[in-house]
Amino acid sequence: MATIKHFQTLGQVIDANITEIASQQNIPRQVAYVRVVNHLTENAIEWRKFSGPNIPYHEPLCRVAYLYGTAPPNANLVETVFRRDKEISDYFDMIHNSKGAVSICAFGGGPGTELLGLAKWIEKRNLGYQIVLDFLLLDKVPEWIDSWQAIKRVIESTLMENYGKNRSDWPI
């Protein structure tokens, strides 16, 4: 039974971020959402420039827009690759079985889509034992750590709700 869902998880993260940012900037939530939509539109234009995108990831609402527009499909791609590619799945298992954990470097890691995609893939496998992941995030935008931590908290909350308080009963 897979309980980790990309849109549900990111929806909780985005909703909490919008509430916090609106409070910090002293603006209504609705205004924050409008600004997110504006960032989505502007970011789409930037990505199509031949000179390379100039996206203001240092702005919190821009990062929320990225979470909304890009994180779900990216997390789905991560999960799909690990689910469909037996070679990478077997390699992942070999590393975990030999070392007791899998260390992953998220280079240009962004908002945490690797964490979300792998968590869903691992849970769906229903292996009967816990997989331990150790992430190293390398990104020129240090603020992405906030969304990584938020995604991790929502995943942990979901796992606790569905598997109980004993973390050794969790799949990840």
What are these regions (language model features)?
Residues Y129, D134-D139:
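Conserved SAM-binding motif I beta-strand of class I
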